[in-house]
Amino acid sequence: GTHSLQDSIMLREFASPHWRDQYLEPLVQGEIFPSFGMTEPDVASSDPTQLQTTAILDNGTWKINGTKWFTTGAARAAYTTVMCRTELDAPSHGAFSMIIVPTDNPGYKIVRETPVLGINGGHYEVKYDNVEVPEENLLGPRGQGFIIAQKRLGPGRIFHCMRWLGQAQRAFDLLCERMHERETFGTPLTKKQLLQKFVFDSACEIQASRHLTLDAAKRIDQGDDARIEIGLIKVVGAEMLHNVIDRAIQVHGAKGLTDDTPLSLMYRHAREARIYDGPDEVHVQSVARRILKNYENNGPGWDFGERDASLVS
């Protein structure tokens, strides 16, 4: 799934040979599952520079203390990659590192599962109580946690958008099929202009999101970090998914609210998409700031085509 793909990219680039040998091949083969610990209950997720979990290096051993939550898949994972504050005197983004913690480690304690919108989706609150791991469990250099996180989250957001496109296609099919099945006042739903607008808007939004996603993926493949393109698709893709499913539910009427179709479950998952991996508001602000920077001091502006790699992204 998405998390395994994200972790395989991260391990390949940043893990020591020992941990690549230990986890990378089993991960790719689907024999083990990963988890990722970044979000904390007492800190706003939109400002991760305030994370409080610490890792202190003492005689070649990291000692980790803190609490994470929304650690997806923690109960079945072989390991968790944990974002920890390791450079206690360093400024903001340079204060954090990524450390691998095997989930069978003493002190790694699952506190509870955290259902989301009534769904038990495998998210957990995890406490790190004097967890000790070797120094070699560090991913990449010290103080590079945010760089590594971005390397993981960037492609991961593209994977999410690809999945959302598949879900939107399913909802679109259900919407159109329902319009052919039902009639009101002697007229099929396919003849209702208002509902035809549902079809038109959904088709436009799905296709626009599809092309935005393909563009972001292409730029990643070309070595661009694609920060702007990824921010765009994270917001536009999540909104598209919500809108298409919402219209499909509306066409199904009360049936769309029941478990007789997959739409009610899809709708709840769609609402999550505007929050996880960064809330919409953070991506909107980040994208706008990066684009505007290209116009400072009579700068080159922003090219929507095959832009110069020197433009800020």
Describe the role of every protein-language-model region.
Residues N65-K109:
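A short core secondary-structure module
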Residues D42-S46, F70-G73, D89-A90, T114-G122:
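Short Gly/Pro-enriched turn/cap motifs at secondary-structure boundaries
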Residues S35, Q52-T54, Y79-M83, M98-I100, ...:
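Conserved hydrophobic/aromatic beta-strand scaffold that supports enzyme active sites
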Residues Q50, D104-P134:
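Flexible, small-/acidic-enriched active-site or ligand-binding loops
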